[in-house]
Amino acid sequence: KSTKAEDVPVYFVDCGANAFSAEGKAYRKDYTDTLKNTVPDQAYSETSGWGFTNPASEVEANGSGDAYTTIRNFKAGNNQKTMTYKFALDAGTYEVVTGFYDPWAQWAGDDRHTKITVADEAGTELAVHEDHKISGSKDSVTLENITLSEAGNVTVNLSPLKKVDSNIDSCDVLVSFIVIVKKAAEQPDIPKTDTKAGLKAAIDLAKT
């Protein structure tokens, strides 16, 4: 392995999946020293340090296949709620990548929009993406420069932006995956084009 500092993924959460794919298993093998999650998705527990914090009665898993087509979503009737995942992180600077795909896009139309925020334990926003339309296209949003001066918990929060009473379930948020990448602390000798190697690997896997 290279002796140069590199970006490394610390969480690869395949939301809604009940097992890692073959690619996911290979990926876990490559980053066995840095990845903190040993299962694709779960409810939060203090012991493991990560997971969704919404009551299990509100959310469900859907889909099969790749990282995009497996999703965590709200059960019908649990409207206008924020979906939150919590993660324990060491001090450092991070990027958070959220992946999206709506299998019900033909019914949602333009109603499924989300605001994405990353916040610290005090609730202070560390990064925000104001408006992302979740559609039938597989895509992702990257939030950068998330810095923790000391170890602690962060939350990734997905909040609905639209309220259309006639199509209320289709206004609710859903998520395909969450990848958290720790940025290399010092990169004096690394060409700029290589600084996102770990992140690129994470996204490439998600698209397979």
At which residue positions do the language-model features occur?
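Compositionally biased, intrinsically disordered or flexible polar/acidic segments
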Residues: 3-186
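Beta-rich interaction/scaffold domains
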Residues: 1-6, 183-208
